[in-house]
Each structure stands twice: as C-alpha cells, then as structure tokens.
C-alpha cells in the first residue's frame, strides 16, 4: 500500500502565542470572523495529507501576497486597502495580534485578506510552488542573544520554503531596527536564491513609497534605533 500521508516534521516554536487577556470585542472577532477568513485547511490536523491550497478559488485569480508575522495588522490592512486587486494572506501565531487584525478588517471592509493564526511553516507546506508575488517580513522577533540566532526567521529552515512558494522575480521586503539582524539577513537571504536590490545607502535608509509606519517602528524610533528597509528579488530557478 502506498503511503499518502507525509510524516509530520518536528518543529520547535519559539515566541508568545497569547498575551494579555482578550477584550470582549476581540473574543467576538475571533469567534465570528476568524473561520470565514481562513485561507483553507493549513494545520496538520485539518490537512494531514498537505494538499495545496487553491489560491485561484480563494482570491478569484488575483495575485497573492504574504505577510509573515503581521503584529497588530496595521501594514497588512493598509496594503489590502491600497491594493484591492491583490489577495493578501497574513500569518501570525500571536492570538492577540490576530484579534487586533480582525478588528481592523471589520473596520476597513474588503474581501482580499485571509488569516492563518499559526506557524508560517505550516502555511508554507500547503502553498503551491511559485504562487506568491510579494512577501513581507516586518520587524520580526530579533532574538538578540547569540545562542538564539538560529530561532530567527532568516535561517534556511524558513528561507528555503519561502523561496519555494515565491514566483521568480517576486519581491521580498524585510524591515528591522536591529543591526545584527540586518547582517544575518544580508548573509542568509541571498544564499536562499535572492538578490538584494540596493544600489546606494539611501535605498535601505528610506522606507518604501507605500510604507505605513507600524507601532513597533514608532517604538524603535522613540528609543533611538534606526530602521533598515531591505528589498530582495527572487531569482530564477
């Protein structure tokens, strides 16, 4: 008998899943809005055979973008409102952030956002190859201690599956205020099949033209840290 269910990989997850007690309205958002906004069966429990998501059915054939760790959702909702012809999937395991995003989606309206409240690696499993046109990684957890650097997103464990799901020529944006995270990003991302598009220092010092500053970035600026805006392009092959 052929084996149809792949072995579930062992994945350690680091970081918060839940913070302060949710407000009543946030619990309502989770109860009422999360299931309708799901991108499809992503978890191993719901999709043990890891069948690919049908993005054409999900977004009516629209181009698809991905935000990895959307925090409170400011940037994701801004992009969705500014680009109604694009479908955007956000992945975030921190349930308080998910609830904040759902509230913003209610206020903004629109039908082009889907939300995965969990580990983006599970989402990578079920995204079709070369299906994503743009990806965002904005102020990810810096894991500042050296022994924890392997927990950062910019490692082969995350970058290789990201590269698989991005179309050739797709754009990958990274924003961070941590100099050592910049260093690791510039070392690891090109190795995964990307080219850095900066031609001059101003290219990483200036925010993107469609950028909206997030709460985390405002906190970094108040504390004297310098944002870096890195743009990469997925290479062919």
Swiss-Prot record:
CDD domains this protein is in? AdoMet_MTases
Q: Where is the active site?
A: 141
All disulfide bonds of the chain are none
One GO cellular component term of this record is: tRNA methyltransferase complex
Q: What's one GO MF term for it?
A: tRNA (guanine(46)-N7)-methyltransferase activity
Keyword Cell wall biogenesis/degradation in annotation: no
Q: Which Gene3D superfamilies match?
A: Vaccinia Virus protein VP39
Q: What is this protein called?
A: tRNA (guanine-N(7)-)-methyltransferase
Q: What is its EC number?
A: 2.1.1.33
**Which Pfam families does its entry note?**
Methyltransf_4
What pathway is this protein said to act in by its record? tRNA modification; N(7)-methylguanine-tRNA biosynthesis
Source organism? Ruegeria pomeroyi (strain ATCC 700808 / DSM 15171 / DSS-3) (Silicibacter pomeroyi)
Annotated family: Belongs to the class I-like SAM-binding methyltransferase superfamily. TrmB family.
Which residues of the sequence carry a binding annotation for S-adenosyl-L-methionine? Answer: 67, 92, 119, 141
